[in-house]
């Protein structure tokens, strides 16, 4: 197996790192600050934020974990996800998230589709998915023949790019927030004028100074390393037992890539399901 990446020190984590993002956003006030800036609104959440919320339609379906899931007083649902690696599938991944969230909103047999909540999905990345150098891309369904006609289905998907260039299209506060999310340090905070970003930084400093939180991070990292090693060795063994030289190389390469992306369940399925393995090889351009 390739050498495990060196563990990042807890104090060096940024909000783009899932562990710190999830722990920070469990604080309801932090999540409200984040949504206030991104959506330019005043947010009041009515229940505690859920992290790593698991969704699936049936036991046989693929499980999806939503990084940070919450609901405001108007029953608007928010899902926020930091994504450090460009898997080149974010538009369709956001579609999957939307579908799974919707499928869990109505009780079985209900046909009152107007009861579906408004849903806002937010993906935060340190790269530009769409190539137009924007900080913020907001998508709603609309009519091609009548562009000003919105479908008004209550679904919004927002993609945030920390490396945007068009300052005039977003608030200074959002730009400061995105810079801070990518590099959550004292130095970055010193250059932020936003009181909300400063408040968020104070909370992050408190988190990073918490020894129990540091121990939790170390334990989570060690468990993830063991899980990856076990899955990799299983894939390697199955490949050696069943495949040709080419197939063994494909399995090893795919397992390594899926480990980097923390897509462990998909890796385990790909080990024994050749059709699914080929699909992933094509998706990841391996």
Segments the model singles out, each with a brief description of its role:
Residues 1-286:
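Elongated, amphipathic alpha-helical interaction scaffolds
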